[in-house]
Swiss-Prot record:
This is UPF0637 protein YktB. It holds the Pfam family DUF1054. SUPFAM superfamilies: YktB/PF0168-like. Gene3D superfamilies: Protein of unknown function DUF1054 (3.30.930.20). Belongs to the UPF0637 family. It comes from the Bacteria. The gene is yktB. InterPro entries: UPF0637, UPF0637_domain_sf. The lineage of its organism: Bacteria, Bacillati, Bacillota, Bacilli, Bacillales.
Length: 212
């Protein structure tokens, strides 16, 4: 099986100074693994969601000065792109790997989906494990662990999605660098697979909006 677990070298890519130097190493070391992860998990996510899912590896093409602080592969039910659609991500920062279900700022269904999340809040907390984390900004590494959030904090996150133009909502897991380095390839893939099985619930909720 192709080696898809990230290594020390992969994490260290995001400490390299300069856009060109970092991108050169990213293309050589990280991107092939993201591509392999995309090919590996697209069929899994298609089966979990009932939608044919297509992988999109981040190209960072618009960058001209600042090097990327993270990189990822996203999965959405369109070959053309993912940013406007409910999607999943696997990626890494210098410090950790992330596995997300995501609705980001370009999504046109944010308001309706936020209302649906608010109505189904109790069901969501029962379906999403307490060890999972929530984020309101995909460009920042900071997160809120579900076990440390009260009902009002989660409700605020859902309300924000309805009312703030640039609002985002992400839910998933973070695997710290040391934890990933201590896994073998199969253990790494299994953790991602397990997370997607839990996160598919949030995707299926979006289908109530998109297929209405």
């Amino acid at each position: 099986m192709t080696q898809m677990r990230f290594t020390e070298e992969d994490f260290n890519t995001f400490t390299i100074e300069g856009l060109d130097a970092r991108m050169e190493v990213l293309k050589e070391t990280v991107r092939p693994k993201l591509t392999a992860l995309g090919e590996h998990f697209a069929p899994t996510l298609s089966a979990l969601t009932g939608d044919e899912m297509f992988p999109h590896v981040a190209k960072h093409a618009r960058r001209s000065v600042n090097p990327p602080a993270d990189s990822w592969v996203a999965f959405a039910n369109s070959k053309r792109g993912y940013k406007k659609l409910p999607h999943f991500q696997i990626g890494l920062w210098e410090s950790h790997v992330f596995v997300w279900f995501a609705i980001i700022y370009e999504s046109p269904i944010k308001e309706e989906y936020g209302k649906l999340l608010e109505v189904n809040q109790e069901t969501i907390t029962k379906n999403i494990p307490d060890s999972f984390v929530w984020s309101a900004d995909h460009t920042k590494p900071g997160v809120h662990k579900q076990s440390e959030m009260d009902k009002e904090q989660l409700k605020t996150l859902f309300e924000r999605l309805q009312t703030v133009k640039k609002a985002e909502l992400l839910c998933g897991i973070q695997l710290q660098k040391e934890e990933v380095l201590n896994m073998n390839n199969q253990e790494f893939l299994q953790r991602i697979d397990d997370a997607f099985k839990q996160l598919a619930f949030l995707y299926r909720l979006t289908q109530k909006v998109t297929q209405a």
